[in-house]
């Protein structure tokens, strides 16, 4: 637990995640259920970065919770790691409609 947590102050990553959750800087916010900022320790030595959230991630607001998440959990387990040991996020924080490829 960092000093910030002990005194109730948010870390820079927590502040960024709060901004992402209410972001309306592109059109994707109109079709999302929840933004998916990422999760895990900000000082994690291992980071997984996907392309964009899928339907399950959009519903739960968490990265890699669908089929890809199950596979990731199995892979992490095989090397004696857990989700809490790594940082997981996506390039896009909102699901593109109908899982289409992201546009610039």
Question: Where do the PLM segments sit?
Answer:
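A polyanion-binding, active-site-adjacent surface
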Residues: 2-104
